[in-house]
Amino acid sequence: ERRLTDLHEAFRRGLMPEQLHRLTGIDPWFLDNLARLMEVEGRLRSFTLSELPPELLVEAKREGFSDRRIARLLQWPLDGDSNLSHDQVIRQRATLVHAARQAQDLRPVFRRVDTCAAEFASETPYLYSTWESGPCESRPSDRDKDIVLGGGPNRIGQGIEFDTCCCHAVQAIRAAGQEAILV
């Protein structure tokens, strides 16, 4: 954690990715991406929500910035009369960022991962969300749905018990006549 904070500070002080690569040995790919995120942060800091250009909001979302992070970075008028905690203020501001996105019809779309390399149709498509423009490829149904939350990333040697449990849960949901969504 400290290393990332130090990199953040080094970029803030003007060091370039090439310099940091020589000093740290960190792969330039990671440093270039971190520098790009810092550059977006810097641009966000120069706007209020009402001044924020829609294309910068889209760029921030594409780069993975949450509404909460955007709310932390934007300039806000001083509110000396507020009895809210800092966290409550940030949550309130994140709600305003979310509302601004909705007003601009800025929402993620879902795309399909072709797990069969176009060799044949996949019966269990994988979807991912993206802020890229284009059509949404999900096909929601009117059926009742249940969500199965997977165990997340596994490390080598952990075993496949979590995957097996998720598969059995999905099979049970389908047997009950409902649609299963595995996250």
What residue ranges belong to the model's regions?
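ATP-dependent carboxylate/acyl-activation modules
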Residues: 1-183
